[in-house]
Amino acid sequence: MKFVDEAVIKVQAGDGGNGVVSFWREKFVTKGGPDGGDGGDGGDVYIQADENLNTLIDYRFQRFYEAERGQNGSGGNCTGKRGKDITLRVPVGTRAVDIHTNEIVAEVAEHGKKVMVAKGGWHGLGNTRFKSSVNRAPRQKTMGTKGEIRELRLELLLLADVGMLGLPNAGKSTFIRAVSAAKPKVADYPFTTLIPSLGVVSVVPEKSFVVADIPGLIEGAADGAGLGIRFLKHLERCRVLLHMIDIFPIDQSDPVQNALTIIDELEQYSEKLANKPRWLVFNKVDLVSEEQADEIIQEVIDALGWEEQYFKISAVNRQGTKELCYKLADFMEQLPREEQEVSEEEKVNFMWDYHPDANQGEVITEDDDDWDDWDDEEDDGHVIYVRE
């Protein structure tokens, strides 16, 4: 199945049902009181995480989703039926972003989580609501409010513990093939990896973690060069980043400049991502002598001002990969989980969260006969008082 990690859809919550003007009619009761019921609320639109899904491809074919409208009220003080909600099932790790405001409306990072993305309209009021001591035959009602309409960009963010980044052909896919059962395509030309892939690394039975391999970055990626920074979003939930550096590039480029390019693109994309724990991994050390490898590594470390630990590996013959995986597993075991979790969700303002204000909408009056005068004392007949 084709991997689709982004889709644009339009959702519309149901409109609220209208209130109704009605009066009680019964045998021998010529002037019954008001009994117009309220309308029903419109249905809401939700997204829900489903672990059985792994792509957003379905939302490329159908792009409009609408919840049910609330029923109008009816006589006998009958309230209209509430509109049915609609739930859109998405892969775990999906977030919904409002295209016009760039606001994150919803984010579902665990199976079964359900979040509202569009709120249904508020119901209209029937004429019973307007009855008072001075208005015993009200002909006023209110219409239901419109349901919320949003244009959303659905983004699928892969859930992984370790994210890999580097230039094309740095050896990221070769590494993930060496340490897991994943088999991403490997070749000697740039951008062999066109879509993200995941691999599960099992160090010992009770210790395992997930590694994400994304397409390589090049200079100018933040401005759209190459595959751009589209796939960097998949690293946002990773706990550790592995910066893979090729010490013997096939295009004979400078490893120092290559390392600086990746860091620059990372900082341009997101300060939060740039501040995540990051390890340097120097790959292809088997292609040069040990002295030459150490010299190149030292140049890179000096240029970056790197003071943390680093690793030397050869992914193709698995030299140093086992030690790296063990240290990654130990590090993540000690890393506080709070640093990995998404920050507490901000409150999203929906259209009709302020119900009291919705009631202050336009009031419609129906005047087609003299029903509103049946309680007028002046119509009770002409009475003459005589003082004796």
UniProtKB/Swiss-Prot annotation:
Biased composition (Acidic residues): 364-380
Subcellular location: Cytoplasm
Cellular component, GO annotation: cytoplasm
Residue sites binding GTP per the record: 166-173, 191-195, 213-216, 283-286, 314-316
OBG-type G domain boundaries: 160-333
Keyword presence, Magnesium: yes
EC supergroup of this enzyme: hydrolase
Chain residue ranges for the region called Disordered: 359-380
Domain Obg residues, every copy: 1-159
Cofactor(s) required, per the database record: Mg(2+)
Primary site of residence: cytoplasm
Gene Ontology biological process terms from the UniProt entry: ribosome biogenesis
Function (record text): An essential GTPase which binds GTP, GDP and possibly (p)ppGpp with moderate affinity, with high nucleotide exchange rates and a fairly low GTP hydrolysis rate. Plays a role in control of the cell cycle, stress response, ribosome biogenesis and in those bacteria that undergo differentiation, in morphogenesis control.
PANTHER family, A to Z: DEVELOPMENTALLY REGULATED GTP-BINDING PROTEIN-RELATED, MITOCHONDRIAL RIBOSOME-ASSOCIATED GTPASE 2
HAMAP family reported for this sequence: GTPase_Obg
Assembly information from the UniProt record: Monomer.
Family that this chain belongs to: Belongs to the TRAFAC class OBG-HflX-like GTPase superfamily. OBG GTPase family.
Identification of the protein by name: GTPase Obg
Gene source species: Vibrio vulnificus (strain YJ016)
